[in-house]
Design a protein with these regions (language model features):
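Conserved strand-to-helix beginnings and helix N-cap segments that scaffold or border functional pockets
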Residues: 66, 73, 131, 150, ...
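Conserved segment of the helicase C-terminal RecA-like domain
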Residues: 155-190
Length: 218
């Protein structure tokens, strides 16, 4: 529906600046729908189940949007995973109850020592926080902004003496088939997401398998 409205807007001959504003809003709405798609939770549960079976649930960071955090918390709780959220709400002032650390520093320390198996992160890990012990990352809310996704990936692939490999799961949403014009617009809109997926895949040890999945995604 949004794609059809985008096509109609592109075909219209109204005021250019007004159309440009409407176009940007529609693109943003579409990006939010993709970022928070319900189908992502099924894939997320499958990944958690696999990691749980392999006993590889420590050192996990899950990057989410604000709309996803409660559902992700519910899934982790149902799997008896010890986690903590890390958002911009956690304090940065040192306090005695956090062993003379800030709340944020305390949470990160608990994660590093294994007291928290997973962190649910919103934005605050995009820059400025170093957690080299993190070895697994799930991108529930992926960004097409190169700076943002490079910073998120960087949180996971940072070298550490106790880390031989880093594992990234980028959960993406496929497009829905429509008429030819809709499909053409869909493909153009998804180009940025494809670039992120390819960049991650091409730098992975399992690049052949990862790129095959991207080809199927196309």
């Amino acid at each position: 529906k949004l794609t059809s409205r985008i096509i109609a807007l592109l075909s219209s001959k109204g005021n250019n600046s007004d159309n440009e504003y409407k176009f940007e809003r529609l693109i943003e709405q579409r990006a939010d729908i993709i970022k928070n798609a319900e189908n992502k939770y099924d894939v997320f549960e499958d990944i958690i189940g696999k990691l749980k079976q392999e006993k590889n649930l420590n050192n996990l960071i899950i990057f989410v949007s604000p709309q996803q955090i409660e559902k992700v918390k519910e899934i982790l709780a149902n799997n008896n995973i010890i986690f903590h959220k890390l958002t911009q709400e956690e304090g940065t002032r040192k306090e005695a109850k956090y062993c003379n650390k800030s709340e944020r520093e305390y949470i990160i320390q608990q994660f590093k020592t294994g007291n928290y198996q997973a962190l649910i992160a919103i934005k605050c890990l995009d820059e400025g926080i170093d957690i080299p012990s993190a070895s697994r990352g799930i991108l529930m809310a992926s960004s097409t902004n190169p700076r943002e996704y490079v910073q998120r990936i960087g949180r996971i692939i940072r070298q550490d003496t106790n880390k031989q490999f880093a594992y990234l799961y980028d959960i993406c949403v496929d497009s829905i088939d429509g008429d030819e014009e809709c499909n053409t617009i869909e493909k153009k809109i998804r180009n940025k997401e494809q670039l992120r997926m390819k960049e991650i895949a091409e730098n992975a040890i399992n690049s052949v398998d990862a790129l095959e999945h991207i080809i199927q995604f196309n």
